[in-house]
């Protein structure tokens, strides 16, 4: 009997090991980054800091998310982002603000840089939406905090869906990337307009 059990366990182990090399490969995706910043003086004499981008737990992990109903979200096991969506967003935002040439400097909060203004945000949605038409949904909100006065001086909310041109995961990624780019450009334009209307160092 014990011999039979040992043979059965050995057979199961062999079957398990034989399947180890035949698993489906994991595919990783990322978003496009802006061009490097031009070496020109910033329009605004502001050292801008980009703070935390908070998000629900599903957006703090790498599997690409999809929504099948108003209350149900799942993730793809073999299709993932190279970084969690909130990190991808933050990195692209910093690069975009640097590339704009609007600021004296743009750095991540907690770095050696110091600044009066902190831009922080929250990511609400970053997923494929499966309905009559497949779409890439992004919802996010940002606020500009003045460390000197202790007040939020500007905020912006963005929520848009981008049609997915195809049924492949790569098409979903492209739609989310396009949507994110559009949303962050809105944020950058709104920030620039705030500082144009409220020049730093002038009463």
PLM features: residue spans?
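Short secondary-structure boundary motifs at beta->alpha junctions and helix caps
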Residues: 71-80, 148-182, 186
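Surface-exposed helix-capping loop/turn segments at secondary-structure junctions
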Residues: 99-105, 189-203
């Amino acid at each position: 009997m014990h011999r039979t059990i040992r043979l059965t366990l050995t057979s199961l182990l062999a079957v398990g090991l034989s399947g180890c090399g035949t698993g489906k490969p994991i595919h990783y995706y990322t978003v496009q980054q802006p061009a490097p910043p031009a070496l020109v003086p910033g329009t605004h004499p502001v050292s801008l800091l980009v703070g935390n981008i908070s998000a629900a737990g599903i957006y703090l992990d790498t599997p690409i998310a999809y929504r099948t109903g108003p209350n149900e979200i799942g993730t793809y096991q073999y299709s993932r982002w190279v970084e969690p969506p909130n990190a991808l967003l933050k990195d692209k935002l910093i690069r975009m603000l640097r590339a704009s040439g609007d600021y004296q400097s743009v750095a991540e909060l907690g770095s050696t840089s110091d600044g009066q203004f902190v831009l922080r945000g929250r990511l609400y949605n970053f997923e494929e939406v499966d309905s009559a038409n497949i779409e890439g949904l992004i919802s996010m909100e940002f606020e500009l905090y003045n460390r000197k006065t202790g007040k939020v001086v500007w905020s912006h909310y963005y929520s848009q869906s981008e049609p997915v041109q195809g049924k492949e995961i790569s098409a979903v990624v492209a739609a989310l990337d396009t949507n994110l780019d559009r949303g962050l450009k809105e944020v950058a334009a709104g920030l620039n307009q705030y500082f144009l209307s409220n020049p730093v160092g002038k009463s």
